[in-house]
């Protein structure tokens, strides 16, 4: 899964407090809490009855689960994403695209995760995952391209949900928190 929540202490003595922590799978980012907590942190105070909390997680394009220093690299994550969009699977998916500190190295696990992203990989929102457009947008964004340079000759056929650089950048930024 995307992660888990752990609260300490658990169970909570009546009238006491508990702090909940999200433990995130490395290809996800922490989201917000829901239920009896909201926002980025979860502290339950003066607990007098059962409480329910849910840790929410956000999928990312950090497909190898690498640390902050090597997260969202075009030569690793970007290359793997483009290859996946081209239909490459197995060892060829990750060949030459490894990075020290990657938490996910199994190509089958990466392909399964990318499959689970589904429509999130349709960067321009035209309904079809295409390495020549969506993959190019991912790679360019990871390389630092923004504005017109990001989208020049890189959008799929219409109708598209996202056609401007601002829309594409916002979509990709949400996948690379």
Task: Report residues per predicted region.
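Short loop/beta submotifs within extracellular cysteine-rich repeat domains
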Residues: 4, 28-31, 39-41, 61, ...
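Short, recurring structural edge motifs at helix starts
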Residues: 5-10, 20-22, 59-72, 117-129
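Short proline/glycine- and polar residue-rich coil/turn motifs
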Residues: 11-16, 46-49
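Surface-exposed interfaces of beta-sheet-rich extracellular modules
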Residues: 16-43
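Conserved "repeat-terminator" motif of extracellular CCP/Sushi domains
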Residues: 23, 42-59
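Short, surface-exposed beta-strand/turn "edge" patches of beta-sheet domains
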Residues: 34-50, 153-157
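Alpha-helical segments with a strong preference for the paired helices of cellulosomal dockerin domains
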Residues: 66-116, 126-177
């Amino acid at each position: 899964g995307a992660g888990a929540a752990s609260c300490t202490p658990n169970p909570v003595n009546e009238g006491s407090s508990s702090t909940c922590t999200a433990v995130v799978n490395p290809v996800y980012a922490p989201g917000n809490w829901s239920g009896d907590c909201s926002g980025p942190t979860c502290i339950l105070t003066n607990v007098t009855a059962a409480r329910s909390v849910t840790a929410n997680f956000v999928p990312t394009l950090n497909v190898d689960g690498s640390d902050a220093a090597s997260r969202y690299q075009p030569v690793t994550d970007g290359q793997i994403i483009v290859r996946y969009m081209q239909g490459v699977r197995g060892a060829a998916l990750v060949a030459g695209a490894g990075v020290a500190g990657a938490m996910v190295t199994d190509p089958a696990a990466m392909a399964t995760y990318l499959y689970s992203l589904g429509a999130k990989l349709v960067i321009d929102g035209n309904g079809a995952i295409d390495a020549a457009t969506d993959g190019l947008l991912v790679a360019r964004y990871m390389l630092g391209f923004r504005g017109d340079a990001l989208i020049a000759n890189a959008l799929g056929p219409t109708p598209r949900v996202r056609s401007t650089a601002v829309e594409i950048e916002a979509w990709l930024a949400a996948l690379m928190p």
